[in-house]
Amino acid sequence: MPQAKLKDLLEFPCAFTFKVVGANRADLIDDVVVVVQKYAKGDYNPRQQLSSKGTYNSVSIDIIAEHIEQVEVLYVELAKIDGVRMVL
């Protein structure tokens, strides 16, 4: 069975959560919100969790995605944030 593509699994508009993992720094959560607001306007209440040693910070943010292109662009742009290791 071929692997399903993300666009085939989602029906737009839909709720979508991004999880951004990066080096623990004070501005990471603010940088994530700025990037998300550029492509998906709204008020956001991101959640963050520090790694056990405090080296990394993960920021989860929920959006209402209007189309697959918006999701794809956000994956790319969030990954460009300074110190980001991965975007899930």
Swiss-Prot record:
Superkingdom of source:
Bacteria
Q: Which Gene3D superfamilies match?
A: 3.30.70.260
Annotated GO CC locations: cytosol
Query: What species was this sequence derived from?
Result: Pasteurella multocida (strain Pm70)
The name under which this protein is listed is UPF0250 protein PM1928
Name the InterPro entries on file: UPF0250_YbeD-like, YbeD-like_sf
What is the taxonomic lineage of the source species?
A: Bacteria, Pseudomonadati, Pseudomonadota, Gammaproteobacteria, Pasteurellales
**Record family assignment:** Belongs to the UPF0250 family.
Task: Read off the HAMAP family from this record.
Answer: UPF0250
